């Protein structure tokens, strides 16, 4: 008996977050979305690169994520591609995030958006910003890994 392969459930990745921040803890959260946004996410029309999470009034909100509406979206209202979206999380997780952001100088960045049991989830991370020299070190390490793999490939 063969099992069905699950298709890749990842909708979008924020590759810029790994370059700009030191990632500490990761959390999973649900998103409050409208119907047209879900349709656009199925089509993959989202950009997470300039987005971040803020905590206001004890709730988490996603800011700056651009979900482009499909051309077939309803004409009865004007969809806002950069609207603020509420994140659904446990109170315990929210309290931990609030403490880290306010006291220790962390920021919260989205890492990826994916499907989980027909629901859209977002992976967010508690992160500290990198300085310019840290980013240069990251670039040097990445280039060294590439060169090392080329050298190993030639020698084999």
From Swiss-Prot:
InterPro entries: SmpB, SsrA-bd_prot, SsrA-bd_prot_CS. The keyword RNA-binding applies. The keyword RNA-binding applies. It comes from the Bacteria. Residues 135-156 are annotated as: Disordered. One of its GO terms (molecular function) is RNA binding. PROSITE patterns: SSRP. CDD domains: SmpB. One of its GO terms (biological process) is trans-translation. Signal peptide: none annotated. Residues 135-150 have a biased composition (Basic and acidic residues). Required for rescue of stalled ribosomes mediated by trans-translation. Binds to transfer-messenger RNA (tmRNA), required for stable association of tmRNA with ribosomes. tmRNA and SmpB together mimic tRNA shape, replacing the anticodon stem-loop with SmpB. tmRNA is encoded by the ssrA gene; the 2 termini fold to resemble tRNA(Ala) and it encodes a 'tag peptide', a short internal open reading frame. During trans-translation Ala-aminoacylated tmRNA acts like a tRNA, entering the A-site of stalled ribosomes, displacing the stalled mRNA. Belongs to the SmpB family. This is SsrA-binding protein. It comes from Legionella pneumophila subsp. pneumophila (strain Philadelphia 1 / ATCC 33152 / DSM 7513). The lineage of its organism: Bacteria, Pseudomonadati, Pseudomonadota, Gammaproteobacteria, Legionellales. The gene is smpB.
């Amino acid at each position: 008996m063969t099992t069905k392969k699950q298709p890749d459930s990842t909708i979008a990745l924020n590759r810029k977050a790994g370059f700009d921040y030191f990632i500490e803890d990761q959390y999973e959260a649900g998103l409050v979305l409208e119907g047209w946004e879900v349709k656009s996410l199925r089509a993959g029309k989202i950009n997470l690169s300039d987005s971040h999470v803020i905590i206001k009034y004890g709730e988490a909100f996603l800011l700056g994520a651009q979900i482009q509406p499909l051309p077939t979206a309803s004409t009865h209202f004007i969809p806002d591609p950069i609207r603020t979206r509420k994140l659904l999380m446990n109170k315990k997780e929210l309290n931990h995030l609030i403490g880290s952001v306010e006291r220790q100088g962390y920021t919260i960045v989205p890492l990826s958006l994916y499907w989980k049991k027909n629901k859209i989830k977002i992976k967010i991370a508690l992160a500290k910003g990198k300085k310019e020299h840290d980013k240069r070190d990251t670039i040097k390490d990445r280039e060294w890994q590439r060169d090392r793999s080329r050298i190993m490939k030639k020698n084999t």
